[in-house]
Structures are given as C-alpha cells and as structure tokens.
Curated annotation (Swiss-Prot):
The chain crosses the membrane at residues 6-26, 104-124, 137-157, 171-191. This is Transmembrane protein 204. Disulfide bonds: none annotated. Residues 27-103, 158-170 are extracellular. It is found in: Cell junction, Adherens junction; Cell membrane. One of its GO terms (cellular component) is plasma membrane. InterPro entries: TMEM204. It is a multi-pass membrane protein. Keywords: Cell junction, Cell membrane, Membrane, Transmembrane, Transmembrane helix. Can influence paracellular permeability. Appears to be involved in cell-cell interactions through adherens.
Length: 226
C-alpha cells in the first residue's frame, strides 16, 4: 500500500519544523540584551548567557584560561524574572512564559502528527492510509502547532529598548511557517480527494431516460472512479 507523495512531503516538512522548533527552544539566543554599563547577554527560553568579550592578543606565558573565557550561563524556568533584567520584568516574564508554553504545545502537536503517520503505516484500521481521518488527524496536529506558535511569537511584537531579537526567534518563525505549509498541503489533499469523490459510488441510470437516445444500452449502472 503506497502513501501519497503529498502526505509524505507534508510529514517531512513537519519533521523539519519539529527540529527547528526544538533547536530554537534549547539555544540561549532568543534575544540579545545590552545593559547600561555595556555588558551584553543572550537570553533563550530556558537559558541566559553573558556574552564575554575576550581581550585581543595572545595570553602571556603560563597564563591559564579563567572564567572570562567561558560563557557564564544560568538556567531559566517558569516565572523567571531574570529574563527581564533592565526591561519591564513583568512584561518580559509574560512573554517568555507564553512562548515556553506555546513551544511545548507545538512540540507535542508536531510529534503527535509524526506518530499518527507512523501508526498509519503499520496498518491500523482507524489510521490506515486509505482512511480520510488519517490525513485529517495529521493536518489538525500540524495546524495546532502553527496556531500556538503564532500566539507565542506575537507576544514579541513589542520589545524594550535594551533588547533585540536574535536568530533563535527567527528560527522559530521558520518552524511556524513550515508547520503551516505542512498543514496546508494535507488540507489541500483532503479537499482534493473529496472533490474527486463527491459523486455516489454507484450511479443508477434509468432505462426510460436513455432508451430514446441509446437503444442498445443494457447496463443498469455505471461505477464512478471513487
């Protein structure tokens, strides 16, 4: 039993979205913050690291690498106010808490879509590739991931003067777009199949309607391609 190319492509796109979503979540590069004293740090959903500028030139003889050569990172969690720092702590805390929740829900939804695809390949009755609910379940999961990522990303439309968005945020935007594309491909495939199969499986042709036009017609029905 072959799987449609559109479905396989959509699942592959969703898999890339899942990888990008997790990469954006666990890298401390969601935003950059600059303090008044000139120090800078990168803040992610779960980590915040100080950006240490190494002095130019080679170290002297016998010098040992100190703490300044290592990124000083701290873990962040739910309700952490350390992400705000010089910005409004309440606003930044809400932004990161919302994004953490949306990121986790999107990860679960994308993983559920991948699991649905794998279970369908095993030949389960309710999730077989011939059943429409198989594609609809995957489309719903990918659309949910896209929806919650949009909600989380919208919270960062306004940031403080000491903060600038970094590449992890744009990586998550790419994950959101790919999840939307995967859902759109599956929805298009489901609607296209329904348009092809809107007619009943058996079309009954009355003899009285066709007798005057085709005298030699002996068939009582014609099967549709669906």
């Amino acid at each position: 039993m072959t799987v449609r190319k559109v479905v396989a492509t959509a699942v592959l796109v969703a898999l890339v979205s899942l990888v990008l979503n997790n990469a954006a979540a666990f890298t401390p590069n969601w935003v950059y913050q600059t303090l008044e004293d000139g120090r800078r740090r990168s803040v992610g959903l779960w980590w915040a690291c100080w950006l240490v500028e190494r002095p130019r030139g080679a170290p002297g003889p016998g010098a040992r690498p100190g703490p300044a050569d290592v990124r000083d990172c701290e873990a962040l969690g739910w309700g952490s106010e350390a992400a705000g720092f010089q910005e409004s702590r309440g606003t930044v805390k809400l932004q990161f808490d919302m994004m953490r929740a949306c990121n986790l829900v999107a990860t679960a939804a994308l993983a559920a879509g991948q699991l649905t695809f794998v279970l369908g390949l095993t030949g389960l009755p309710l999730l077989s590739p011939d059943a429409q609910c198989w594609e609809e379940a995957m489309a719903a999961a990918f659309q949910l991931a896209s929806f919650v990522l949009v909600i989380g990303l919208v919270t960062f439309y306004r940031i403080g003067p000491y903060t600038s968005l970094s590449w992890s945020c744009y990586l998550n935007i790419g994950a959101c777009l790919l999840a939307t594309l995967a859902a759109a491909m599956l929805i298009w495939n489901v609607l296209h199949r329904r348009e092809d199969c809107t007619a009943p499986r058996v079309i009954v042709i009355s003899r009285s309607l066709t007798a005057r036009f085709r005298r030699g017609l002996d068939n009582d029905y014609v099967e549709s391609p669906c």
